[in-house]
């Protein structure tokens, strides 16, 4: 209760604090004058003191009350006024967004930019009737007027990125003229035109993002110019035609259009509208005014398979699942059909179909089957009933899921702890692809709610493979799973946290307890992620244990019966094919948690006794962990030992065998010094004798041996005179034998020309006989054979040729066929004579013995008979014509012949044609009846029906219609309808239409309602419901008079607010884009590469959405290899010098000026070390010779004659001061500026004299002064000045330097600075002074070093020309004493070292101001250092003009840190990261001045 009251108390304080704020006096008076001039007393009432509490009404800066944000002013006059708003009325206010409503506006306000700080101007005034000049350069300009008419030139909008022109009068409008020059068409991005009379031609406008076009009711359809739509090349085109005009649906669009919204009253198409060629279109929205735009109840368009469809307020009767009658949809599309009359039940899904459907606001009934589980289905506000499938119920605790099914009558739509029994995700890890694969059932689709543990993380969001059933995520390449065995995933819906294995691993229990009631509890790992994830079985001894619960790390089960407790029992856990065995004690309550060494190596080698932690090794294995192999012979004799690594006896050199019981004798060595010559030869180590293989011989098997073939007589080479060569293994036969074994006799066949069998046969040397080849004969195969068997006895074979010579009465090659001649051997040239029969074979068109007679076939009837058969039908084969009998007709005599009715011997009475096939008359158009003797008169025809059909009748003899009770007229074409209630006496009834024509002031079907007017007649954005007086706004139009425009995303991505004047989102700081979904990205630090090229790292804010990312360094593309929300890694080629860097994504570009500096391989030294040292070109530092010092070795190191410096801190100004003699050097942090990309100063914070001392810390080493001041209500800047009491080394970005005693170290912290734009940057100004004190020098011997009052000498050359080793030097010399300033060219930006540039802001005779260009960072750490030294012109003895010069070592090191403080957090997180080659901002010695004499007084810079 106390906390509650405290909270209310603080709210009260905050409220009163807000009310107490007032604008600065000049702004107060400016707004007061405006309120007074225009009498705005209602919105701005006076308070009790007679003044105004402006900041309680308009937006004021909560710190200083300045009206520097959004200002909206509205006239309170209800009648026309002559008081005009002019530019000077409000130019005294610093707002950045102005909205003027219903004032009389001066035209100069439109064309002159009076409000310099303003970027957005909106005017709603009917005093604007035309736009005749170029509008003032406000980036966003809105003009709303009911009297804005005529032709508007696009050249008048060349200064705008966003333009909104609205004529809210539905009876008039304007057109657009494309007259701008090409170079002036680039800037316009978001045009919004309302009240158009035709589609504008936007040829040449290439930067359009999301234009919108609203057309007036006054447009003429004939001059609408729909063809111009294809000139609108934009990411998204929106066209809204009025509901009062019917137009053809446009069919031609620009190829670059990705998103299309079109609203109108479209004519009913007669054919499908093919938009499939517009393959770049990703989404098309069709917003209907009536129900006609369909074909047979289907969406009448055909799109590409990549175009999403959004259709609303139409008439679609068929629920489309996989497509329509015109097109098959793809899985890449989403389908939305809202408020369009869909009815019936949702059919089950099958096949390849889209995975997104939105059927909200229809009349779909029935249940939702589980076939819809793997789709994104939305059925809000339908008539569905029954139970939702478990795949949906599991995720109803997610409000985004639940709202998809509200507005129905589902019985299980429970959003709090919904029952879930089917949730079963499965995980697979592919280490080669560094990918986690998620499959399973009913795990949902809300990937952002799948959270991995810290072991793993997805580089990006989960990637869909198959919607609802297969997703993958890739973990970073730097992550290794070699040592990761498992990990967990937290599924926010349905609220389950599961641990999954990353490897295949047997169950690993580490604790097993048998409890009461035969329960068993097992703890460990690699069991089952949940019951059913793997197949599990558990047994203890021979008793099964039924699993009750299971997770990755525990199992509970119940034994079927009590186990024995006398001895340890074997526990067996099986998961899929993996088995784990262990022996346990089954004593109730005993914890078997003793793990064995190395888990007994493996399940095949041993089993662990988990009651005492010892292994029971399986047969063949030995050792504490069963890792050793038992020898096959337990005792190795003759001094042998058992090697348990391999399980074999190791014998000494004179013994062998498994148990070392046999002696060992070596056999002789042969070829290649191998025992028994190696190869397949073997040695008998017991006898020492070689046993050669079949191919070798000899004592050491070194001689080859090949056996010859053995003959049938079992003799080698068959014995006799045959011989064998054992070296080659080949037999050599004598002259009377042959064959590989010489076993066959050899007999020569007959020869011809010394060739056996004449070369035409095969000789059988065993018999001496020839076997002739086919076609040859005789004993020596020298003759030829005939093809027949001795010419069949009808001829003689000529063996010299192999041809039959037939006798005269025979023919053919074998003389087998008799020869007969025809009567006419030529067959009249119409056939062929067959000599085998002597008969002519005629062709198809002739006949007869000699083929001399023509032949024509008669037609064949349907009964397959010539001339249809019958006795009376005759065929003439010479003419091919049938002659029919009297009862048949037709060419094939297949048709009956029937006579028609005849009168006066004239068929059909002479008024018709007789059909002898049917015997019926076809009367002419003027006669009727069977014999055509009655006259025929036609009745009137309407709708292609005689007398309009229905129950109307026609008298064809008179030609007169007789109408039924519901029709009238000569053709019965007019309905007869009475009006309901006779129009209630408030109108006139048309009985033909049954429609009432109401009197003025009445409406309704029966004139039963009076007319109520709507506000502003619904502007042009809706239809008036004159019954209720309420506007029904068109889609994307809002407010009670439909005057407002709804943004594409009304919530603006939850990162902005919708401006209903133009339908555009006003994004929160840090977001951009039409729907505010993109972060306003920027880079805060860059780690460059060497001049040879390589990997570049960019850190900053880039968000989760990175469409078409691109990085440019100067003019070179840096190829992106990886991108996250806060870093980019890219690869660039070689280059050199300082470059701009740009990061482009999501269509927006960010540029960092001079932010990239290639790392040099070699560095030069300042002034080449003045020949007083050696240059270290790796670091760019001088290594001075003895006696010299300084960054360029131009100072002497002798310091014993110099008085010490005195460091101080001014507690009022926070200035660091070092005094030395009469000289005072002062270092101040004076200004912080927020600068634009074009280097303009947007904001400036004067830091000088505004510091507040917080604390002084003094100890033996240091003395620290802490100051701070507020920059805005949410950011501050603090400064610490530390007086160094002992020498010490400071490291900054891998750069080391020494801070000497009596130095001052300055640290600056800029906390939580909020930039006005992501392209802006901060510039910090540091000022250094040198001047005289009023002290009298006690070192008179050095008076010759005092100047004569002349100015100090300042050199800032290196600062302006930074080319040396990351260090810039500025020096101030006074009385030969030097304030030496070194500025490093790197800062630590948000924890990362990055390059910065610096420049001289101002320089006069005794001071210099340096500006450090900080990156767009939240935390910046800058580290310049300052030193007071002696010039080489300093004289040790004034009498000796040639004496050596000395240096006073007094150093001031300044560290400026921007460690941003997170608002509302008690934790300060600071992170430093250093890289090679830091920027050093150094002070350089200027030219020497040898003037002497007494000090003429102080010179203040």
From Swiss-Prot:
Keywords (alphabetical) are: Developmental protein, Disulfide bond, EGF-like domain, Glycoprotein, Membrane, Repeat, Signal, Transmembrane, Transmembrane helix
GO CC annotation, single: membrane
Cited SMART domains: EGF
Cystine connections: 631-642, 636-649, 651-660, 786-797, 791-804, 806-815, 822-833, 827-840, 842-851, 900-914, 908-921, 923-932, 979-989, 983-996, 998-1007, 1047-1058, 1052-1065, 1067-1076, 1165-1175, 1169-1182, 1184-1193
What is the role of this chain? Answer: Regulates aggregation via a pathway that involves lagC and tgrD1/lagD. Inhibits lagC and activates lagD expression.
Please name the Pfam families in this protein's record: Beta-sand_ComC_1st, Beta-sand_ComC_2nd, ComC_SSD, EGF_2, EGF_TEN, LRR_ComC, TIG
Q: Species name for this entry? A: Dictyostelium discoideum (Social amoeba)
Q: What lineage, starting at the top, does this entry show?
A: Eukaryota, Amoebozoa, Evosea, Eumycetozoa, Dictyostelia
Query: Any idea what this protein is called?
Result: EGF-like domain-containing protein comC
Q: What PANTHER family does UniProt report for this protein, alphabetically?
A: EGF-LIKE DOMAIN-CONTAINING PROTEIN COMC, EGF-LIKE DOMAIN-CONTAINING PROTEIN-RELATED-RELATED
Q: Which residues lie on this side of the membrane: Extracellular?
A: 21-1446
